[in-house]
């Protein structure tokens, strides 16, 4: 009997005690004369909270009656945080904190935003905010790459409780180094008290929480949700809004008397489901006479400590939000706080002051949630899944336009159980999928193995959703994908859902290359060795227009050939219409020969080429764009791109087809437009950019060179004119060769010859050269003598009558 009583007591003790306290105390062997300088910071509210750096979980800040920043999970004694007197803070109370990097945190102190580099111990006032604010919101992304960094840099600063419209909202796209005033035109129709503004990256939306008549409602600014709102919910007093990490769309809205959650970025806000004694009911914190003192969360878990010395633990998923009372162990104090260091590892943290040292120690109690939930008194069913794994964890995937992505997961259910796997996306407006579950073998114990195959692509390409449901295909989007078990029990703590982030946007491994199968070097026209030695060539002033100013060129242009970027030029015959063959490469592999619409521009201003099609022959229905529209920004050819391109093959009342004979300067796509080079040999350097908005989200562009050959020098006269002139001159010359000798034998010819002789004799000024004049005289004399008859008497002498 005694043994049974001892066993019962032991069971009760185990149910109540879920962890053991330990105290962290370091660096206090010898007396430390350190004194605190500046103003001691404190949290403006009566509760406590631990804000973690979600990308580097060893870093966190504790907010309470004192403020502490740790870089090692509070595993050392820490001095309370102070702000220098030079910052001139009237009331050093913190209302919001947000980590922006591994070394910097933003604080809202007394209505102003300050940045603190806790590695260098440098404080700075953030520029751009001119009116008091109370909160900073952001959603950090922890994957590597520029895309994720851009998400993390987007922040809002706002005053909670301000009247809309009329309250200034500030935004930052540089990680909080500076802020700008947000344009309020898009929010002019919103009315109520501002409860917060947030970047919901998992839904590709900006959400605004407005409160009116004790009802809170989320409004969205981006299509297709900009004309709809979330479901209203009861909002009687200000609520703190926590965006849970990893862009899953999970929210927590809470204060000391309220706890609400959302699994879809605020579209539906609901209460947690309390599991107690086998029953499940909505948790009403106020009716349960509880006062939440501190709350903790990670991606799929949450926990909170109440002033009534009770610790609650719950899970948050797309299928349900359940919570259970974990322990009645005495945790609570005014300084106590809770936070997660890992999945299923919950820590109760309490700063402890030291009368002899300024640094605070920390009393810690680490709760193994999985072990605590195994207590039979909680009456929880065991986890119905033994194994759930996939390679998609801890990776971010990219789906470009017209691309697909295939993922898979492996599931092993608990023996005798038949769980249902569930695939969910956070942004169904942009991302769609289909999934297939197949059995593919057994474990050693005879348990079945299942494989889940998932195929994802843009929602627009599935063709099974309404037009007003899908997001704009021209704009990039983000969504998470999660694989979970639909009927998973609360005890599956260690079996977290499989989830990752999908970027419906530009795949940075893509690039375009102009095919170069026949080059000028391969044909022996150019020498690649010479091209690499600062090779230069001349562009005649008649062949180019300056790119730096408008007007005609005044001098020839000398261009140095960039062999490293251009390689050997492609060889093109001048008299043959030509179109570049553009290849699309992805991650070093040739994907396809591109057939999208693109444009080219000669970078040195050469204008001796044209296009084979006009607006009419290209079957345009509106006036086509051309480079003259962007001529004011000739130094920025990238301004004509997929975002600024407007197709002429669609009706456009604002730009009707008025000039059908203008050049159609777009290559590729539905037309067979080609380049026609003028009668000029030489090198052309082109910039090529893809303008088709439905081909890729990337700004695909490249530069390439061609060498045009085979052009003869340009004739100064028209060919027909030259031929007529040549024939006329030939015939006239032949007539003169016949007519002149004949005329010289006549009396008129002799008189003409004598007349010419007299002119050359008495007009020496006609030829100033004596030698040449003598030659001409002798020539004329010999010609005259030769042409005369043999018996003509000599001039100036009488004839010999005797003979």
Curated annotation (Swiss-Prot):
Residues 743-803 are cytoplasmic. InterPro entries: CATSPERD/E (IPR028751), CATSPERD/E_C (IPR053814), CATSPERD_b-prop (IPR053813), Ig-like_CATSPERD (IPR055451). It holds the Pfam family Beta-prop_CATSPERD. It is found in: Cell projection, Cilium, Flagellum membrane. Residues 782-803 are annotated as: Disordered. Residues 1-15 form the signal peptide. GO terms for cellular component: CatSper complex; sperm principal piece. Glycans are attached at residues 226, 418, 436, 468, 534, 545, 626. Keywords: Cell membrane, Cell projection, Cilium, Developmental protein, Differentiation, Disulfide bond, Flagellum, Glycoprotein, Membrane, Signal, Spermatogenesis, Transmembrane, Transmembrane helix. One of its GO terms (biological process) is flagellated sperm motility. The chain crosses the membrane at residues 721-742. Belongs to the CATSPERD family. Component of the CatSper complex or CatSpermasome composed of the core pore-forming members CATSPER1, CATSPER2, CATSPER3 and CATSPER4 as well as auxiliary members CATSPERB, CATSPERG, CATSPERD, CATSPERE, CATSPERZ, C2CD6/CATSPERT, SLCO6C1, TMEM249, TMEM262 and EFCAB9. HSPA1 may be an additional auxiliary complex member. The core complex members CATSPER1, CATSPER2, CATSPER3 and CATSPER4 form a heterotetrameric channel. This is Cation channel sperm-associated auxiliary subunit delta. It comes from Rattus norvegicus.
